[in-house]
Amino acid sequence: MIPKMDTEAYLDQLLGVGRFSSLKDGLYVLKLFSGVMVDIVMYMTVLRDGTVKTRVEVVNWGAIDNTVIHEETISRERACNIVRNQFYVASALTNVCRDFMEKAVGELSDIENSTVEGDIILDYQKVVSLGQFEVEVLYNSGGYECTLYPMYAEQQKFYTKDIDRVESFLSKMKKKYDATVKRVVEEELSKIGD
């Protein structure tokens, strides 16, 4: 059998396992993680020699550009094992989101108690997506309302006038979250062998 067709036959047998599906001949998609406005997806392209080129992207549904966080060419066996063991990656990413949400709640609670008053920007609006939750910041009658929207829990609201601290915190947290997600995806994929 031709190596490409052989690999496709193996992968076709796994269609429907978890969140693994086929887009077209030789192109497969594995949704590793579902977030509020952000998903983490692995695209698998079967090459002529039967190997599989993988590309993991953070798909941001609110923006046009996606971020590539991992690429490699792997064997057919390893591709099949990744599909079978996808839930380990999803579980690790869920733990990352939970940890970051706890940090966000703690920090926003601290900021809420701040007596510092920042600039007043009447039309201020900012939304930061961090996997399974989002933080929205709006100016509202003399202060800023920070609303945390988790996927699986009730929203939480925090009020502050210290917008500089909120912006600084959200910016640092987003960078740290992105770096952590990349590291965790690479670590979890490296654990899955042939």
Region roles according to the model:
Residues 4, 48, 70, 113, ...:
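Intrinsic disorder/low-complexity segments, especially N-terminal tails and targeting/processing regions
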Residues 18, 26, 72, 79, ...:
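Small side chains
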Residues 38-85, 133-171:
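Intrinsically disordered, low-complexity regulatory segments enriched in Ser/Thr/Pro
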Residues 17-22, 36-42, 52-58, 106-118, ...:
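Generic structural motif
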Residues 1-37, 88-129, 189:
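Negatively charged, low-complexity tracts enriched in Asp/Glu with abundant Ser/Thr
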Residues 14, 24, 32, 47, ...:
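Generic alpha-helical secondary structure signal
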Residues 6, 33, 55, 128, ...:
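Residue-level detector of intrinsically disordered/flexible regions characterized by low predicted structural confidence
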Residues 8-15, 76, 80, 84, ...:
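Residue-level detector of alpha-helical secondary structure
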